[in-house]
């Protein structure tokens, strides 16, 4: 997961057809990972939307990660799942999905991060690194905690939370290799241009 833009969707912001169109533009701009997060949808809607996104991701040859729902990830044969601390335990998700699937874990403390690595998580989602309006319960972690996590684990770290076109370079200058964004791409009139801009920051 080297120098990558990771796009996370938000079904609270727009209808699925609009989202699909914006995601396609973002993938065209070089987004390399997509996480489908559906907090409002029924299981049937989530499943149908995940299938559509899977075909889109296949077209661009990038992984589709499902937020929270191991059952949906399994049902559509997605590339992986991203789990929070209150979701199904990583070890259980691994038994269900198998060794080949990507499993990411949200971590806000060094202890969470080390346990996730011990249990063979593929990457960590660490944040929020800035205040964010996308997740109301997201608390900002200190730069010290972030660096402590970096120092203690060797698996890839994805930074998330409040990352915008204006502050992304601050993180990249700190040596961050992967940033996860929502609004920074999906709220733009031209998601492709936003994705290109973020990718260029790594250069």
Regions inferred by a protein language model and the residue ranges of each:
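A short, polar/charged loop-to-alpha-helix boundary motif
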Residues: 88-89, 132
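As written
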Residues: 120, 174-177
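Short, electropositive alpha-helical surface patch
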Residues: 177-184
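A short acidic, helix-capping loop that chelates divalent metal ions and anchors anionic groups
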Residues: 73, 130-136
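Conserved N-terminal beta1-alpha1 strand-loop-helix module at the mouth
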Residues: 1-88, 95-123, 141, 148, ...
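Short, histidine-centered active-site or binding-site loop motifs used for metal coordination
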Residues: 38, 128-130
């Amino acid at each position: 997961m080297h120098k990558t833009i990771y796009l996370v969707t938000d079904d609270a912001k727009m209808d699925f057809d609009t989202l699909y169109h914006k995601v396609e533009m973002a993938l065209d701009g070089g987004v390399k990972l997509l996480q489908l997060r559906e907090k409002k949808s029924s299981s049937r809607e989530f499943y149908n939307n995940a299938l559509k996104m899977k075909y889109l991701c296949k077209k661009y040859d990038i992984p589709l990660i499902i937020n929270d729902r191991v059952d949906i990830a399994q049902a559509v044969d997605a590339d992986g799942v991203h789990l929070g601390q209150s979701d199904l335990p990583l070890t259980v998700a691994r038994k269900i999905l198998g060794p080949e699937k990507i499993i990411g874990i949200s971590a806000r403390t060094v202890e969470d991060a080390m346990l996730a690595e011990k249990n063979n998580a593929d990457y960590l989602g660490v944040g929020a690194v800035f205040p964010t309006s996308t997740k109301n319960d997201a608390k900002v972690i200190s730069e010290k905690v972030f660096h402590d996590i970096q120092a203690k684990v060797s698996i890839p770290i994805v930074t998330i939370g409040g990352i915008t076109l204006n502050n992304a370079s601050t993180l990249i200058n700190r040596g961050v290799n992967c940033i996860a964004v929502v609004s920074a791409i999906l709220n733009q009139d031209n998601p492709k241009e936003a994705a290109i801009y973020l990718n260029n920051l790594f250069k």
